[in-house]
């Protein structure tokens, strides 16, 4: 039997680099900057009550050609396709008021990413030349990232992307879900209206207590390595999750209920189906038992039946 290693919860993020005259020295410095940036973001976020738990390094770094929209689009498509678990994309921009800034906003919205643009010059000097102090800069970014993550989770127009074909520019379709669709799903799962029966309910669990900015991908990561078949967000920090079978639900509850993500977030995980307590058996009293024994010991009288 192979035991799966259950990694602690870490949100994944990616970096897009659009820099003029990019060379190996700049690449090495940006890799070092990425770790410094995410750690500083975590510390400053905790100071104002926003607790980020991103991995220390980006899961991928994608380079694009300056001033090339197709190159920029391909970078976001690549992240979306190859790393669907990515929540945050940090885009290193070549200069202020660049086209890449506008493209970043459009593409991040299209593929459902939280975005944060940074000027390369500020990255190179670690924000030493900005007008405001470094703490304020990072706390403003923390607030933006938190609000953006919450907006993605609650946005009525949040879409699933479907790519058709193998061409360089496949067709991209959006499937929109409005609040009524979500509300119907919640009622079907949690209430008596068309409630799932038997095996369907046994495959579901309730999870709460995680950071409110998480979207469905982030919630699924919490339950690694179990296979998540569906997620319905029921509140700012609660959701109903469908797993593969009832055995995975049982094991996931054992593994994750009460798990601390950080000092302010503790998971609460339970099965959607609450087992009914066994009906207690009513044993006869000693006096009644003796009476029953006496009755059993008496001879049986048969009445004569006339034919």
From Swiss-Prot:
Disruption phenotype: RNAi-mediated knockdown results in chromosome segregation and cell division defects in early embryos. RNAi-mediated knockdown results in defective activity of the PIWI-interacting RNA (piRNA) silencing pathway. RNAi-mediated knockdown disrupts the localization of tofu-6 and erh-2 to the perinuclear region of the germline. Instead erh-2 accumulates in the nucleus. RNAi-mediated knockdown results in decreased expression of tost-1 in the germline and in embryos. GO terms for cellular component: cytoplasm; nucleus; perinuclear region of cytoplasm; RNA cap binding complex. The keyword Nucleus applies. Expressed in the germline (at protein level). It is found in: Cytoplasm; Cytoplasm, Perinuclear region; Nucleus. Coiled coil: none annotated. The keyword Cell division applies. Keywords: Cell cycle, Cell division, Chromosome partition, Cytoplasm, Nucleus, RNA-mediated gene silencing. Its main location: cytoplasm. Component of the pid-1 and tost-1 variants of the PETISCO complexes, which have roles in the biogenesis of a class of 21 nucleotide PIWI-interacting RNAs (piRNAs) that possess a uracil residue at the 5'-end (also called 21U-RNAs) and embryogenesis, respectively. Within the pid-1 variant of the PETISCO complex may stabilize 21U-RNA precursor molecules. Promotes the biogenesis of 21U-RNAs. Required for chromosome segregation and cell division in early embryos. Component of the pid-1 variant of the PETISCO complex (also called the pid-3, erh-2, tofu-6, and ife-3 small RNA complex) containing at least pid-1, tofu-6, ife-3, pid-3, and erh-2, which is required for the biogenesis of a class of 21 nucleotide PIWI-interacting RNAs (piRNAs) that possess a uracil residue at the 5'-end (also called 21U-RNAs). Within the complex interacts with pid-1; the interaction is direct. This is Protein pid-3. It comes from Caenorhabditis elegans.
